[in-house]
UniProtKB/Swiss-Prot annotation:
Pathway: Isoprenoid biosynthesis; isopentenyl diphosphate biosynthesis via DXP pathway; isopentenyl diphosphate from 1-deoxy-D-xylulose 5-phosphate: step 4/6. Binds 1 divalent metal cation per subunit. InterPro entries: MECDP_synthase, MECDP_synthase_CS, MECDP_synthase_sf. It holds the Pfam family YgbB. The record marks 34, 133 as: Transition state stabilizer. Homotrimer. This is 2-C-methyl-D-erythritol 2,4-cyclodiphosphate synthase. Its EC number is 4.6.1.12. It catalyses: 4-CDP-2-C-methyl-D-erythritol 2-phosphate = 2-C-methyl-D-erythritol 2,4-cyclic diphosphate + CMP. A divalent metal cation binds at residues 8, 10, 42. It comes from the Bacteria.
Length: 165
């Protein structure tokens, strides 16, 4: 078994689209970034890559590469999944936290889970999503940005041993 942790932050910007877990969330502000700025999916990809010992998304999908400009982070997640499977890993579980002062995100959890279960080929019971505010503290509290954190447990299916890898 291997554990990976991912973290990402993007600034909020008026007129941008807010995308979390591949879901478009209506609002006046969205996240700015080189790709679609899906902070939740970025944290998830970093957690999976970290558990595999494969650096981070900046290494694999650099923002200096114009081919990633505006790309859906779900497409990048599929690429990460395609790196993971041939190496004999499967996902044990995923735990995600979104840090945002607003909007209320719980109505979107099921759609986010649907996106992730489709791409990662796992049951939705293996994915947990939660959101929290920072009680108006820091850049999240001032609504300057949104942060996300992910923890992932990978199981080495080739070894079948809890100490594998």
């Amino acid at each position: 078994m291997r554990i990976g942790i991912g973290f990402d932050v993007h600034p909020l910007k008026k007129g941008e689209t807010l995308i979390l877990g591949g879901v478009h969330i209506q609002g006046e502000y969205g996240l700015a970034g080189h790709s679609d700025a899906d902070v939740l999916t970025h944290a998830l990809m970093d957690a999976i890559l970290g558990a595999m010992g494969e650096a981070d998304i900046g290494y694999h999908f650099p923002d200096t590469d114009p081919s990633y400009r505006g790309i859906s982070s779900l497409k990048l997640l599929k690429k990460v999944y395609n790196m993971m499977k041939p190496r004999g890993f499967s996902i044990g579980n995923i735990d995600l936290i979104i840090m945002a002062q607003s909007p209320k995100l719980s109505p979107y959890y099921n759609k986010i889970k649907e996106n992730y279960t489709r791409i990662l080929q796992l049951d939705s019971s293996r994915i947990n999503i939660k959101a929290t505010t920072t009680e108006n503290l820091g850049f999240v509290g001032r609504e300057e940005g949104i942060a996300a954190q992910a923890a992932v447990l990978l199981i080495d299916t080739k070894e079948g041993d809890i100490n594998a890898g």
